[in-house]
């Protein structure tokens, strides 16, 4: 049901932030050996919990399919959707408020080397596996039509099914955002038998989405994302969060040591940025831990 009144108050009373995400793509949202939710998208949820509740563990992750993303955020039953969600104007109008692009991705293709091709333009008449209810599916159709490739799409509801179909040879190629291809490909038994083709056929700006109808909550989540980015820009990392004046006006303002960037107007604590950065680190730390050297080892090109 849609929430009456302030979502921030509701979250504080509830004592946790509810995020719709996933557990099937390493780097973005998966389970570690102990069964904990980990990943880039999960850390964005933890950052919000740190800011609002002072506790990065005060989260509930609800796993949803790609095709369930719109209805889930429209219903207002979750506080935030963080599930590799591409910003589009129609989704922004119909689903919820896109907060900020936190990763710039682009769609690509992975194929088995035995197919003997080196370009996506050679996929004439091919069968390509893709997830339902995604921009990926729409882009594939556009790419096929534009280049007269007559590609057949084989669609599945969830990523695991797409990967299984590709690995069992039901399709010639598998298409997804390039970072997800790298992540999922890293888990293949014979990784070296597969190549990601050079073409990037779309722009995929990924970021969190919040329900329509609560500007305060939208602003809070936007501010949390900004803290991650500015923390890195100002050289503040999880291991070096000062609690007394540094003499650097911008750092002191961000950390709530001196001055303000408007925390009190938003209803978050003066030192919320300290809580966020201590708990999850800055943008670069989150990237490196999940998508970079500590995770799926994706080079940080135009990531943010």
Residue ranges and their predicted role:
Residues 12-16, 49-57, 74-78, 114, ...:
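Sec-exported extracytoplasmic/periplasmic mature domains
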Residues 18-27, 37-52, 86-87, 104-163:
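Bilobed "Venus flytrap"/periplasmic-binding protein-like clamshell domains
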Residues 46, 50, 54-122, 181-200:
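Acidic, polar ligand-binding/catalytic clefts
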Residues 24-27, 66-69, 80, 86-90, ...:
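Solvent-exposed loop/turn segments at secondary-structure junctions
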């Amino acid at each position: 049901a849609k929430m009456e009144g302030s979502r921030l108050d509701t979250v504080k009373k509830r004592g946790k932030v509810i995020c719709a995400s996933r557990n099937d793509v390493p780097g973005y949202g998966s389970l570690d050996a102990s069964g904990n939710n980990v990943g880039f998208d999960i850390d964005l949820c933890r950052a919000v919990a740190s800011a609002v509740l002072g506790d990065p563990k005060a989260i509930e992750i609800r796993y949803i399919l790609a095709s369930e993303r719109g209805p889930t955020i429209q219903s207002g039953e979750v506080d935030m959707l963080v599930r590799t969600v591409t910003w589009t104007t129609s989704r922004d109008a119909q689903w919820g408020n896109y907060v900020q692009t936190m990763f710039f991705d682009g769609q690509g293709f992975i194929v088995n080397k035995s197919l003997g091709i080196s370009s996506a333009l050679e996929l004439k008449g091919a069968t390509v596996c893709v997830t339902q209810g995604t921009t990926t599916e729409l882009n594939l159709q556009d790419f096929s039509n534009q280049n007269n490739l007559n590609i057949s799409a084989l669609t599945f509801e969830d990523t695991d099914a797409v990967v299984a179909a590709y690995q069992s040879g039901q399709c010639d190629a598998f298409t997804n955002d390039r970072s997800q291809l790298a992540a999922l490909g890293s888990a293949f038994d014979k990784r070296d038998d597969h190549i990601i083709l050079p073409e990037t056929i779309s722009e995929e700006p990924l970021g969190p989405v919040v329900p329509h109808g609560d500007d305060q909550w939208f602003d809070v989540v936007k501010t949390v994302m900004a803290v991650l980015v500015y923390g890195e820009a100002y050289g503040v990392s999880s291991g070096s969060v000062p609690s007394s004046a540094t003499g650097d006006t911008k750092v002191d303002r961000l950390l709530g040591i001196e001055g303000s960037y408007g925390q009190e107007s938003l209803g978050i604590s003066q030192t919320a940025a300290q809580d966020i950065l201590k708990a999850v680190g800055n943008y670069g730390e989150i990237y490196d831990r999940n998508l970079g050297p500590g995770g799926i080892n994706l080079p940080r090109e135009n990531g943010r």
